[in-house]
């Protein structure tokens, strides 16, 4: 049996994680591999039947995983060659354990894409468990909105001011409307002053054109 792997691709918002995942899915499909695309039910930015990147690439979502969903009990993997999971930071530790089991027992590659930390610099539950269990972790680069250094952290703003309070999971409006990627020095500076953030816009990674 082919040995499966659990892989974690992570970056701050707008570095191209979902686009990267969908490009991987399309490439796998062109090679005749049977692809299963999944995302958490808590990702309500788009309809549950679609996974869509900010650059416009989209594909059909095969399953949405709610809190009680089991990747080991609720899915038959006989016709699956590769499993790709978007927004994996929203999964529970148990579900990440199950994805590890899927890779080991069924011998298929599992690719999880998601944020590493929230805007308070705390690991998400799913991301923490992925770091502990994954075979390979890949970080996509994005630059700091303010100084153009590596932007590994998130700055959340409300009414033009940086904030460090509130729930870690906040999808009331699209994430690129309230978060920017920043370096640690800029995160510290902006959260320790009352300076207003003018026209906050995230700098996106370079997008590769794809025929739709």
Swiss-Prot record:
GO cellular component, one term: cytosol
Positions that bind ATP: 11-18, 43-45, 86-89
Disulphide-bridged cysteine pairs: none
Residues that coordinate or bind substrate: 119
Binding site residues for Zn(2+): 144, 147, 183, 186
Name used for this protein in its record: Thymidine kinase
EC identifiers of the protein: 2.7.1.21
Keyword set includes RNA-binding: no
Keyword Cell membrane assigned: no
Active site: 87 (proton acceptor)
Family: Belongs to the thymidine kinase family.
Keywords carried by this UniProt record: ATP-binding, DNA synthesis, Kinase, Metal-binding, Nucleotide-binding, Transferase, Zinc
Reactions accelerated catalytically: thymidine + ATP = dTMP + ADP + H(+)
Species of provenance: Encephalitozoon cuniculi (strain GB-M1) (Microsporidian parasite)
Any one Gene Ontology BP term: DNA biosynthetic process
Tree of life domain: Eukaryota
An annotated Gene Ontology molecular function: metal ion binding
InterPro entries: P-loop_NTPase (IPR027417), Thymidine_kinase (IPR001267)
């Amino acid at each position: 049996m082919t040995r499966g792997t659990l892989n974690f691709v992570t970056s701050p918002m707008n570095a191209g994680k979902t686009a990267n995942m969908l490009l991987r899915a399309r490439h796998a499909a062109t090679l005749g591999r049977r692809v299963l695309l999944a995302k958490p039910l808590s990702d309500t930015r788009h309809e549950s039947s679609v996974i869509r990147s900010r650059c416009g690439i989209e594909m059909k979502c095969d399953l949405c995983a709610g809190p009680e969903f089991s990747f080991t009990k609720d899915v038959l993997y006989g016709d699956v060659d590769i499993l790709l999971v978007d927004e994996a930071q929203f999964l529970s530790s148990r579900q990440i354990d199950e994805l590890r089991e899927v890779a080991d027992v069924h011998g298929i590659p599992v690719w999880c894409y998601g944020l590493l930390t929230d805007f308070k610099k705390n690991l998400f539950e799913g991301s923490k468990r992925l770091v502990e269990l994954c075979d390979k972790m890949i970080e996509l680069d994005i630059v700091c909105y303010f100084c153009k250094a590596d932007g590994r952290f998130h700055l959340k703003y409300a009414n033009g001011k940086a904030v460090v309070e509130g729930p870690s999971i906040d999808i009331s409006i699209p994430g690129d409307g309230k978060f920017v990627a920043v370096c640690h020095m800029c995160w510290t500076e902006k959260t320790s002053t009352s300076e207003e953030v003018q026209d906050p816009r995230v700098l996106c990674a370079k997008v590769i054109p794809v025929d739709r």
